[in-house]
């Protein structure tokens, strides 16, 4: 039966094998090489398409599971998936405004960025998320704080019966300019969190 599945449904079979071994980076690396040998396309993690485990998308490519990224827990993945049902995330600001930030901590965000999980949203490259704009705080940390403040004000406006409606608008933060990482640096950081 296994040989039949591997021969007739190779992408689905390998997605299941990868999901079954996703807690062991060495095994994931081994099976990713097997996918490459079989000619299967494996796409990196993506907050707009990935699930907790490895899956096969409409183009018959295997999508890396966010649960296989080191430091990204099930709670973070579940809140990302739950809130993208409305529509895909369009920017880091859209993401931090919508998801439950109690479930997705700073480390989860950092590792998602390093793994390429936010590459599909907006025109922010990975180095920009870690840019410290002279104040010792990364742009990613500022974005998370922005989302927390936005949610806090939204919740307090909803729970206060006698308060006047807040017309407070939130301008997205300025995305810092900086050099992109070289491919070597980007791949090295990616390997730290996904094993390949």
Language model regions located:
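Noncatalytic, beta-rich nucleic-acid-contacting surfaces in large DNA/RNA-processing enzymes
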Residues: 1-196
């Amino acid at each position: 039966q296994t040989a039949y599945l591997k021969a007739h449904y190779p992408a689905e079979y390998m997605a299941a094998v990868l999901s079954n071994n996703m807690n062991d980076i060495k095994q994931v690396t081994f099976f990713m090489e097997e996918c490459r040998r079989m000619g299967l396309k494996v796409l990196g993690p993506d907050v707009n398409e990935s699930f907790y485990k490895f899956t096969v998308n409409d183009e018959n490519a295997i999508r890396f599971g966010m649960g296989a990224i080191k430091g990204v827990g099930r709670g973070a993945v579940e809140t990302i998936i739950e809130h993208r049902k409305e529509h895909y995330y369009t920017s880091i600001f859209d993401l931090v405004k919508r998801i439950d930030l109690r479930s997705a901590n700073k480390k989860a965000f950092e590792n998602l960025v390093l793994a390429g999980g936010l590459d599909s949203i907006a025109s922010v490259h990975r180095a920009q998320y870690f840019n410290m704009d002279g104040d010792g705080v990364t742009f990613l940390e500022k974005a998370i704080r922005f989302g927390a403040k936005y949610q806090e004000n939204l919740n307090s406006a909803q729970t206060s019966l006698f308060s006047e409606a807040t017309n407070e608008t939130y301008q997205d933060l300025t995305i810092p300019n900086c050099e992109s990482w070289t491919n070597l640096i980007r791949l090295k950081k990616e390997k730290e969190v996904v094993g390949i």
